[in-house]
């Protein structure tokens, strides 16, 4: 039972880190990255469909995204979805592909993105601590199953070590993203 609790803590904390990385990848840092478009859905035959299911997205240059729709009739919907998104990008359509030029970031924009990155990191830390609390509650419930106090204390310490490890990893991910955004 103790091993299952530790495994559950590890899995959930790991998923939080993966979600953080995915979220940060979608934030623009002055460089083109197909993950920027992950949260954009376009209306396609009456239903909202993720952009990466409607087109091939590539990076031909450092600051250019090239979107090649598999169905040319979806180009208008893709353009409209990009314009409606909070990315602030202007698509240019040449009839076969859509180009997105990522503009240089101003200092003010960079600082705002860094604030958002830090906020996202803090939210992930809160999620990790919440997982720790839930797992510690599960461990405390083991007292009813005749598990020794020493085993319970050791398990709680192990959970805390995992928490500390993941919090440190979050800090390094956030720090790296800040450097990426602030470097000109």
UniProtKB/Swiss-Prot annotation:
The keyword Protein biosynthesis applies. GO terms for molecular function: ribosomal large subunit binding. InterPro entries: Ribosome_recyc_fac, Ribosome_recyc_fac_dom, RRF_sf. Keywords: Cytoplasm, Protein biosynthesis. The keyword Cytoplasm applies. Disulfide bonds: none annotated. GO terms for biological process: translational termination. It is found in: Cytoplasm. Responsible for the release of ribosomes from messenger RNA at the termination of protein biosynthesis. May increase the efficiency of translation by recycling ribosomes from one round of translation to another. This is Ribosome-recycling factor.
């Amino acid at each position: 039972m103790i091993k299952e609790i530790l495994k559950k803590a590890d899995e959930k904390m790991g998923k939080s880190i993966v979600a953080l990385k995915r979220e940060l990848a979608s934030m623009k840092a002055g460089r083109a990255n197909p993950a920027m478009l992950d949260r954009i859905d376009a209306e396609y035959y009456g239903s909202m469909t993720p952009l990466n299911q409607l087109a091939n997205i590539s990076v031909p240059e450092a600051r250019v995204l090239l979107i090649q729709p598999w169905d040319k009739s979806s180009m208008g919907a893709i353009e409209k979805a990009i314009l409606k998104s909070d990315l602030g990008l202007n698509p240019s359509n040449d009839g076969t592909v859509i180009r997105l030029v990522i503009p240089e970031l101003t200092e003010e924009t960079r600082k705002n993105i860094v604030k958002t990155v830090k906020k996202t990191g803090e939210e992930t830390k809160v999620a990790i601590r919440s997982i720790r609390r839930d797992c510690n509650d599960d461990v405390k419930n083991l007292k009813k199953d005749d598990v020794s106090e020493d085993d319970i204390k050791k398990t709680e310490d192990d959970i805390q070590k995992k928490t500390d490890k993941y919090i440190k990893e979050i800090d390094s991910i956030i720090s790296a993203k800040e450097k990426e955004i602030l470097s000109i």
